[in-house]
Design a protein with these regions (language model features):
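Short hydrophobic/aromatic beta-strand or adjacent loop that forms the aromatic wall/cage
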Residues: 49, 147-151
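Conserved hydrophobic beta-strand within the GNAT/NAT acetyltransferase core sheet
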Residues: 89, 120-122
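Conserved active-site alpha-helix within GNAT-family acetyltransferase domains
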Residues: 114, 118, 125-148
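Conserved N-terminal entry element of GNAT/NAT acetyltransferase domains
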Residues: 1-16, 156
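A conserved beta-turn-beta hairpin within the catalytic core of GNAT-like acetyltransferases
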Residues: 69-86, 96, 115, 145
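Conserved acetyl-CoA-binding loop-helix of GNAT-fold acetyltransferases
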Residues: 88-91, 97-110, 133
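Active-site rim helix/loop that mediates acceptor-substrate recognition in acyltransferases
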Residues: 26-57
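Conserved beta-strand in the GNAT
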Residues: 53, 59-75, 85-90
Length: 156
């Protein structure tokens, strides 16, 4: 499956795809659709932030991006010194556990490096073992709302 994937950076005029991602993020994490829509529109106009789409057979199946602002920074502003955050890595439910998320992360890293980004951070409570396998280093455990998340970093 992962050998049949294509990857592309989201462009500002891909309104239908932006809307689809906003719907995915609402369904998965209850992030308001309008908030995601506006965020994705704005980052597509900024070379230092981006969103990658994975497609299979021409159909979007996964997405994630590199952002300056992530939810953790609202509760823990001390992490704002780190400018690039991998976030909102999502694979459609029926294709999870097939290596798509790992391949997507690799493609995001390639795009980041090509943009001159040398270090990326993330936070997670559900996929720490995946990120460890992908070479990420655990930095700190942080209480974030009702859960404890692991802040991680990777030099690329």
């Amino acid at each position: 499956m992962k050998d049949d994937l294509d990857f592309q950076v989201l462009l500002p005029d891909e309104i239908d795809t932006i809307q689809m991602i906003a719907n995915w993020y609402f369904d998965e994490w209850q992030i308001p659709i309008e908030k995601t829509f506006l965020k994705l529109k704005s980052i597509t106009l900024d070379d230092s932030q981006f969103q990658v789409i994975a497609t299979h057979g021409g159909q979007p199946v996964a997405t994630g991006g590199v952002y300056h602002r992530v939810g953790l920074l609202e509760k823990e502003p001390r992490f704002a010194i780190h400018q690039h955050w991998l976030g909102l890595v999502y694979t459609i439910p029926e294709l999870r556990h097939q290596g798509i998320g790992a391949e997507l992360c690799s493609q995001i890293e390639v795009n980041a490096k090509n943009r001159g980004i040398n270090e990326i951070y993330l936070f997670s409570d559900t996929a720490v073992s995946l990120y460890n396998r992908l070479g990420w280093i655990e930095v700190e455990l942080v209480v974030f709302g009702h859960r404890t998340v692991t802040v991680m970093k990777k030099e690329i």
